[in-house]
Amino acid sequence: MNKKLKLVLIILLILLVVYAGGFFIWTQKTFKPTAQLNQLVDVKNEVQHKDGMYIFKPKNMEPKDGVIFYPGAKVEPTAYSYWAKKVADAGYLVVIPEMPLKLALLGKNKAEEAMKADPDIKEWYIAGHSLGGSAASAYALKHPHKIKGMIFLGSYTTEGSNLSKAHFPLLSIYGERDGLTTKAKINGNKSFNPADTTYYEIKGGNNAQFGMYGPQAGDKKARISNKKQQDQVIKEILFWLNKENQH
């Protein structure tokens, strides 16, 4: 190996190490639950954390069905505890997996582990926020027989995860002022959704307020409070789940 080639390889290796290190540091700067969420939910005592899963169980009743939720990029699972607990209180088991490097796209098959949280549950929904929804749709595309339906929070299906031939239903909830998952993106990708898709727009809502972790770069400022947006999410999810449960 001549000296010039060796020098080029060394430079490329250094650049690769620097890039990998920078990417790792970027993934560690996560979006954590706000003080408001910690006032609304006692995560340590009200949420079970086991085998890399955050589990929200119904109280004094057997779960009707299960909901597996994939977080948005770099968002801590507990940032969704408010709405997840409310959905659990209504009778549905909610499981939020921890993702590799906090990126759901690196853990598309985490649903397999999540289902082990309660082997007695026979029917599962898969859901996701933003990029978490993209990862969830990739799982649904490959395992349509394992899920009863899907829920998007500020997310959408793309041609790469075309679900237009899927026989399960989809609930798509999005914010009017979402600067990341815009209405243009949602409308432009509707053809990739299942025929049985329900759309619900939260007036004044944005992307970040599908969790409770504070503002996010690229998003627009919401015109409703974080709790008000979450309460609408809870209402629509439960209305839809209960309707599907009657089928």
Where are these regions (language model features)?
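Active-site-adjacent alpha-helix of alpha/beta-hydrolase-fold enzymes
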Residues: 174-228
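Conserved alpha/beta-hydrolase
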Residues: 84-104
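N-terminal membrane-anchoring alpha-helices
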Residues: 1-45
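Gly/Ala-rich beta-loop-alpha elbow adjacent to hydrolase catalytic centers
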Residues: 128-136
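Short beta-strand/loop motif that positions the catalytic acidic residue
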Residues: 166, 172-174
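Active-site glycine-rich loops that stabilize anionic/oxyanionic intermediates
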Residues: 71-75, 176-177
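Short beta-strand element of the alpha/beta-hydrolase
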Residues: 64-72
